[in-house]
């Protein structure tokens, strides 16, 4: 088996980085642009494999999408402009694509089959199947957990529902709201904890109307959307890897440019500041929710991460776990059982990977207990097909002074950050 040899024993990281476009916003720009009336132009779109799966799905649904002058141009014909696909819709590794597009297709008068890769086929879809069934959609997957492939028969006469989310999930909320845009009457979604709100913000940006009152979102349908020009900010989930690298590698100083700082996504910034991180925000644009972040090596202390903070940093928890291995004292992550049904069981995989390198982490049912600081050593590792595990391991390897770190299945990183290793080499000044 050929494994990638990762860079180890790095000196201080120096330089400026522009992280790729935000994955969540990129997906939603394509999805809403595909059903808005008119020509939507998207700048700064992430060209990772997940977003490409969303683009291909809409091409298969009859939407004209092409690249012009570094922009993605989407010729939307409204909700009535989608046509039955001639083939199965393949969502690759993308849970966002499958869940949100299932919600959107709920109101269409045709049937589709949606499949995914091996990893996506192990992710439960019951969380969207049940609310969509209540709205009048025929939808089913495999076993009680409704694993992909999904078979869906849309319904032009969707029923509005009031639905209390049993879990904190922006994807489930989004699937219901996308269906609700096509249902006649008032749909309400009540969240357990407030999750990322890109769908709500972007529905409004495309001319849709909804009311957000704390954890309750109300949308009266049906509605039509109007094409927009969208600029996608840098992805804070991708920036998180450089943020942590800058904090834990002695002598480092990095400037992360144009990072999206939507308040439902900035949990990691609050956590690292509480742990003692030295970070400075430059060129903050509160209206556009973007900033540049200057980060320098810092001495950190352990902390507790739980409750309403978890949905605001769920994707950053693997790299936060690495950060905690270098902090003084104990860090406890709780209420994060959702990590077990991501691209991998991230609680177990993070624990096993970092412990194999010398960390002191105990996995719990809903999180991890991490004792630091610990010295990290070489090991044979894998992404397990999970992009965030791969990038976490590559940053961990930079700290290794003894031994080599080899990484299997590194191609998974293409999902969200195709230029990750190129950027890493640029910041490593030998």
Curated annotation (Swiss-Prot):
Protein EC? 2.5.1.19
Instruction: Tell me the residue numbers annotated for binding 3-phosphoshikimate.
Output: 23-24, 28, 169, 171, 315, 342
Q: Pfam families given for it? A: EPSP_synthase
The principal localisation class reads cytoplasm
Q: Where does phosphoenolpyruvate bind?
A: 23, 95, 123, 171, 346, 388
The keyword Phosphoprotein is assigned to this record: no
Q: In which pathway does it act?
A: Metabolic intermediate biosynthesis; chorismate biosynthesis; chorismate from D-erythrose 4-phosphate and phosphoenolpyruvate: step 6/7
Protein name, per record: 3-phosphoshikimate 1-carboxyvinyltransferase
Per the UniProt record, the source organism is Streptococcus pyogenes serotype M3 (strain ATCC BAA-595 / MGAS315)
């Amino acid at each position: 088996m050929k494994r990638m040899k990762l860079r180890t024993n790095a000196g201080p990281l120096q330089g400026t980085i522009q992280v790729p476009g935000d994955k969540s916003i990129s997906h939603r720009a394509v999805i809403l642009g595909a059903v808005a009336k008119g020509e939507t132009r998207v700048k700064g779109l992430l060209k990772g494999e997940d977003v490409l799966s969303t683009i291909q799905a809409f091409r298969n649904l009859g939407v004209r999408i092409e690249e012009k002058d570094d922009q993605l141009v989407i010729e939307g014909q409204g909700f009535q402009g989608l046509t039955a696909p001639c083939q199965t819709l393949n969502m690759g590794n993308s849970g966002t694509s499958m869940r949100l597009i299932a919600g959107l297709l709920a109101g269409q008068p045709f049937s589709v089959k949606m499949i995914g890769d091996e990893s996506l086929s192990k992710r439960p879809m019951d969380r969207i199947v049940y609310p969509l069934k209540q709205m009048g959609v025929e939808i089913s997957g495999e076993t009680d957990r409704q694993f992909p492939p999904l078979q869906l028969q849309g319904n032009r006469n969707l029923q509005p529902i009031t639905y209390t989310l049993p879990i904190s999930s922006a994807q489930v909320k989004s699937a219901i709201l996308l269906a609700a845009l096509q249902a006649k009457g008032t749909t309400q979604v009540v969240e357990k904890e407030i999750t990322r709100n890109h769908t709500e913000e972007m529905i409004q940006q495309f001319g849709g109307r909804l009311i957000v009152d704390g954890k309750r979102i109300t949308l009266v349908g049906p509605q039509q959307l109007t094409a927009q020009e969208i600029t996608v900010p840098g992805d804070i989930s991708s920036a998180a890897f450089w943020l942590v690298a800058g904090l834990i590698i002695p002598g480092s100083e990095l400037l992360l440019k144009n990072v999206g700082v939507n308040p439902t996504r900035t949990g990691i910034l609050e956590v690292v500041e509480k742990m003692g991180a030295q970070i400075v925000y430059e060129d903050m644009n509160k209206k556009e929710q973007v900033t540049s972040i200057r980060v320098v090596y810092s001495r950190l202390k352990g902390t507790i991460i739980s409750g309403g903070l978890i949905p605001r940093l769920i994707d950053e928890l693997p790299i936060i776990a690495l950060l905690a291995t270098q902090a003084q004292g104990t860090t406890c992550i709780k209420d994060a059982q959702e990590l077990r049904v991501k691209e991998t069981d991230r609680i177990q995989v993070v624990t096993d990977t970092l412990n194999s390198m010398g960390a002191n982490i105990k996995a719990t049912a809903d999180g991890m207990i991490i004792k630091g600081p610990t010295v990290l050593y070489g090991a044979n590792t894998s992404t397990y097909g999970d992009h965030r595990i791969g990038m976490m391991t590559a940053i961990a390897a930079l700290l290794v002074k003894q031994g080599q770190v080899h990484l299997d299945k590194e191609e998974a990183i293409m999902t969200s950050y195709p230029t990750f290793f190129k950027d890493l080499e640029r910041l490593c000044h030998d």
